[in-house]
């Protein structure tokens, strides 16, 4: 029996030129893996992701959530604060809802050029989400 995996995407619009490319690569890889992207929520930035992740995790037809974002280094340590806090809360939500949430977030501490070179983080996050859903389902059998 083939397991269908339903995904929700949470995408940051900050640095949208990069997150758009990440989103497209992630969508293509989901299709390649036979997964369905059921929902997409675009949020202002990475720091805003946890609430949208929570809303998707509450849906019965979502097996996993993929986060897609890009945090570029600025003059202060703001990029580190944003990524570390968002990642911690996103991990907490995965445990709270007992569903995988994967980090397709590049940064902190990178330049725009480095961010463009890391567009495949979206693909990696989809790969991890699908693998986690399948492996966790196998544990239940």
Curated annotation (Swiss-Prot):
Q: What is its pathway?
A: Cofactor biosynthesis; riboflavin biosynthesis; riboflavin from 2-hydroxy-3-oxobutyl phosphate and 5-amino-6-(D-ribitylamino)uracil: step 1/2
* Residues the record lists as binding 5-amino-6-(D-ribitylamino)uracil: 14, 46-48, 70-72, 103
| Binding, (2S)-2-hydroxy-3-oxobutyl phosphate | 75-76, 118
Quote the cellular component terms of the Gene Ontology held in the record: cytoplasm; riboflavin synthase complex
EC number(s) reported in the record: 2.5.1.78
**Catalytic-site annotation from UniProt:** 78 (proton donor)
Superkingdom of the source species: Archaea
Show the CDD domains listed in the entry: Lumazine_synthase_archaeal (cd09211)
Q: What does the UniProt keyword field contain?
A: Riboflavin biosynthesis, Transferase
Q: Which InterPro entries match?
A: LS (IPR034964), LS/RS (IPR002180), LS/RS_sf (IPR036467)
Gene Ontology annotations of biological process type? riboflavin biosynthetic process
Give the Gene Ontology MF terms in alphabetical order.
Answer: 6,7-dimethyl-8-ribityllumazine synthase activity
Q: Known catalysed reaction(s)?
A: (2S)-2-hydroxy-3-oxobutyl phosphate + 5-amino-6-(D-ribitylamino)uracil = 6,7-dimethyl-8-(1-D-ribityl)lumazine + phosphate + 2 H2O + H(+)
- Could you tell me what this protein does? Catalyzes the formation of 6,7-dimethyl-8-ribityllumazine by condensation of 5-amino-6-(D-ribitylamino)uracil with 3,4-dihydroxy-2-butanone 4-phosphate. This is the penultimate step in the biosynthesis of riboflavin.
Q: How does it assemble?
A: Forms an icosahedral capsid composed of 60 subunits, arranged as a dodecamer of pentamers.
Give the family per the record: Belongs to the DMRL synthase family.
What is the protein name given in its UniProt record? 6,7-dimethyl-8-ribityllumazine synthase
Origin organism is: Methanocaldococcus jannaschii (strain ATCC 43067 / DSM 2661 / JAL-1 / JCM 10045 / NBRC 100440) (Methanococcus jannaschii)
| Organism phylogeny | Archaea, Methanobacteriati, Methanobacteriota, Methanomada group, Methanococci
């Amino acid at each position: 029996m083939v397991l269908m995996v339903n995904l929700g995407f949470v995408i940051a619009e900050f640095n949208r030129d990069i997150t758009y490319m990440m989103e497209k690569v992630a969508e293509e890889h989901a299709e390649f893996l036979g997964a369905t992207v059921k929902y997409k929520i675009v949020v202002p930035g990475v720091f805003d992701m946890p609430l949208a992740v929570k809303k998707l995790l509450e849906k019965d037809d979502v097996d996993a959530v993929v986060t897609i974002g890009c945090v570029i280094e600025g003059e202060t340590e703001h990029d580190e604060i944003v990524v570390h806090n968002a990642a911690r809360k996103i991990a907490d939500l995965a445990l709270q809802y007992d569903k995988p949430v994967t980090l397709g977030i590049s940064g902190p501490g990178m330049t725009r050029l480095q961010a463009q070179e890391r567009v495949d983080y979206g693909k990696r996050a989809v790969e991890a989400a699908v693998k986690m859903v399948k492996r966790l389902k196998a544990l239940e059998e």
